[in-house]
């Protein structure tokens, strides 16, 4: 199936990027930690992908490197963790931060992620810690960033609304998302900056 895409970014609507390759536009759902690294619209980028088929939809998830994709695949194998929750986890933490939290059994850090309760956090620690033993090379080798241009930091009048919408898409309730963005909002910040700062503040 589709494992890698190289193309031109047509649109960026966190957490979805529209990537055109071969005359076809692919909607790719990305963790915000990966989304931050994307160049601006009109530039070329490469993403590693994982294709998920559901009864009501076919969704493509994208990552900047194979390590992030490997972790995503392992997350969705965990009981009670679907693609949407896995995306939220990797939006709140980088792949390495998540690995460290599991290895150190930092339950408090995990339950701060959207959709993660104590039982799910405990399950993640037990199941993922065991899997990491067999995935050490895949997760801990230096990641190679395949974004071809430096990221841009555009500003927008709708930055706060976009940030709230992205947080809701990641699993936060609308009121909670608005509160998170209002807490860190500033006039010169792009939506990506607001999302990143809101997620950091939540942790």
Curated annotation (Swiss-Prot):
InterPro entries the record matches: DNA_helicase_Holl-junc_RuvA_I, Hlx-hairpin-Hlx_DNA-bd_motif, NA-bd_OB-fold, RuvA, RuvA_2-like, RuvA_C, RuvA_C_sf
Domain of life: Bacteria
Record's comment describing the protein's domains: Has three domains with a flexible linker between the domains II and III and assumes an 'L' shape. Domain III is highly mobile and contacts RuvB.
Annotated spans, Domain III: 155-203
DNA repair is among the record's keywords: yes
GO terms for MF: ATP binding; four-way junction DNA binding; four-way junction helicase activity
Biological process annotations from GO: DNA recombination; DNA repair
Protein name per UniProt: Holliday junction branch migration complex subunit RuvA
Recorded name of the encoding gene: ruvA
Region annotated Flexible linker, chain positions: 143-154
Chain intervals for the UniProt region annotation (Domain I): 1-64
Gene3D superfamilies: 5' to 3' exonuclease, C-terminal subdomain, DNA helicase RuvA subunit, C-terminal domain, Nucleic acid-binding proteins
Family: Belongs to the RuvA family.
Keywords: Cytoplasm, DNA damage, DNA recombination, DNA repair, DNA-binding
Subunit comment: Homotetramer. Forms an RuvA(8)-RuvB(12)-Holliday junction (HJ) complex. HJ DNA is sandwiched between 2 RuvA tetramers; dsDNA enters through RuvA and exits via RuvB. An RuvB hexamer assembles on each DNA strand where it exits the tetramer. Each RuvB hexamer is contacted by two RuvA subunits (via domain III) on 2 adjacent RuvB subunits; this complex drives branch migration. In the full resolvosome a probable DNA-RuvA(4)-RuvB(12)-RuvC(2) complex forms which resolves the HJ.
HAMAP family named among the record's database cross-references: DNA_HJ_migration_RuvA (MF_00031)
GO CC field: cytoplasm; Holliday junction helicase complex; Holliday junction resolvase complex
Function: The RuvA-RuvB-RuvC complex processes Holliday junction (HJ) DNA during genetic recombination and DNA repair, while the RuvA-RuvB complex plays an important role in the rescue of blocked DNA replication forks via replication fork reversal (RFR). RuvA specifically binds to HJ cruciform DNA, conferring on it an open structure. The RuvB hexamer acts as an ATP-dependent pump, pulling dsDNA into and through the RuvAB complex. HJ branch migration allows RuvC to scan DNA until it finds its consensus sequence, where it cleaves and resolves the cruciform DNA.
Subcellular location: Cytoplasm
Disulfide pattern: none
């Amino acid at each position: 199936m589709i494992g890698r895409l190289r193309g031109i970014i047509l649109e960026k609507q966190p957490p979805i990027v529209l990537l055109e390759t071969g005359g076809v536009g692919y909607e790719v759902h990305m963790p915000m930690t990966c989304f931050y690294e994307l160049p601006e619209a009109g530039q070329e980028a490469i993403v590693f992908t994982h294709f998920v088929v559901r009864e009501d939809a076919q969704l493509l998830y994208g990552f900047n490197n194979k390590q992030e994709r490997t972790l995503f695949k392992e997350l969705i194998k965990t009981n009670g963790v679907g693609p949407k929750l896995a995306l939220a986890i990797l939006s709140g933490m980088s792949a390495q931060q998540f690995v460290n939290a599991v290895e150190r059994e930092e339950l408090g850090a995990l339950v701060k992620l959207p959709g993660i309760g104590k039982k799910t956090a405990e399950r993640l620690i037990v199941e993922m810690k065991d899997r990491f033993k067999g995935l050490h090379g895949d997760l801990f080798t230096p990641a190679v960033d395949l974004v071809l241009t430096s990221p841009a930091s555009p500003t927008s009048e709708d930055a706060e609304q976009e940030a709230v919408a992205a947080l809701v898409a990641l699993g936060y309730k609308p009121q909670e998302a608005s509160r998170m963005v209002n807490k860190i909002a500033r006039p010169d910040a792009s939506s990506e900056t607001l999302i990143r700062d809101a997620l950091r503040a939540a942790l």
